[in-house]
Amino acid sequence: MILRIGKNISQFYACSTFYLDSLVCSPQGSEILMKQMLAAMKDSKPLPAPKMTKEYHYKNYPTNSITTYIEIKTPRMITEKYEKQQWQLLDSTRNISGYPCKLAVCQFRGRTYKAWYTMEIEIEEGPWKFHGLPGLIVEIADIWDHYHFTLIGMRRENIKPVCFYRTDRDDMENVSRIEYLKGSREQYKLIQKRKKRRGQTMAYDFLERDYH
């Protein structure tokens, strides 16, 4: 995963998602992607596709909002106001990737999280929708460790401006966050039923669990 922090916007996305989107938008991208897919099928290897749902998350500082571009079968856009996490700051300390960190915990949309932040980087930012601590979040995970983000590297020079990518697709659908989660949950239930008939199991729950 990649977190890019700009003056007015931050951007969070998977490396594989960005690679494929960049490839498709390049002049020979579609041809290259097709060759990669044919080679993968020939060698019985996984197809060159994101290992998760295609998502881009943007924190828009001037409008105090978060916009998510997400795609499973069709592209959707979700815009929501910041929901500040209610952090409890604790005394525990730890060193992560060379940075002295302090511990904070919060409950957010159905999960309890432990976050390690460093005051050596005085930016109230973090991965996904996390923010609001007195320093950059360098590691955060829910208490079941279903979702875990850890800083492994940082670049501060030769960075392209952080901005919204163009999403002027005719089939883009605007939906609410809860509407999207409920709809996606119904799709996963159907997939689970099909797998169960084949003797397979599928254990999965969303990062946000407040849609019940």
Regions found by a protein language model. Give the residues of each.
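Gly/Pro-enriched, hydrophobic low-complexity segments
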Residues: K102-F164
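Generic detector of intrinsically disordered, low-complexity, polar/charged segments
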Residues: L3, N95, K129-G132
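Structural motif
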Residues: I96-S97, F108
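Extracellular or lumenal secretory-pathway regions
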Residues: M1-Q86, L90-T93, P100, K114, ...
